[in-house]
Amino acid sequence: MATKLKITWVKSAIGYAKNQKLTVATLGLKKLHQSVLHDDTPAIRGMIRTVNHLVTVEEVEA
C-alpha cells in the first residue's frame, strides 16, 4: 500500500519568511490546526523540511 503523509499546521507563520508562508499555502493549509493528506514524495518531503517548525507530520497507510 502507498504511504500518505498527514500534515497538520500547528504554529502560525506570522514573523517567518515569505517563502515559508508560501510553502504552507502550497501544501494546501489555510487555517491553523487544519490537516491535509499528501502522497509521500520527495517534493512534499522537501516542503515539509522547509516548514518543519510549523507543522507536524504523521505517516498514514492509505
Swiss-Prot record:
Instruction: Please verify whether the record's keywords include DNA-binding.
Output: no
Q: Which organism is it from?
A: Heliobacterium modesticaldum (strain ATCC 51547 / Ice1)
Which HAMAP family does the record associate with it?
A: Ribosomal_uL30_B
Listed NCBIfam families: rpmD_bact
Q: Which UniProt keywords apply?
A: Ribonucleoprotein, Ribosomal protein
State the Gene Ontology terms under molecular function.
structural constituent of ribosome
Protein encoded by which gene: rpmD
Q: Which family does it belong to?
A: Belongs to the universal ribosomal protein uL30 family.
Q: Quaternary structure?
A: Part of the 50S ribosomal subunit.
Q: Name one GO cellular component term.
A: cytosolic large ribosomal subunit
Q: Which PANTHER family match?
A: LARGE RIBOSOMAL SUBUNIT PROTEIN UL30M, MITOCHONDRIAL RIBOSOMAL PROTEIN L30
Name this protein carries in UniProt: Large ribosomal subunit protein uL30
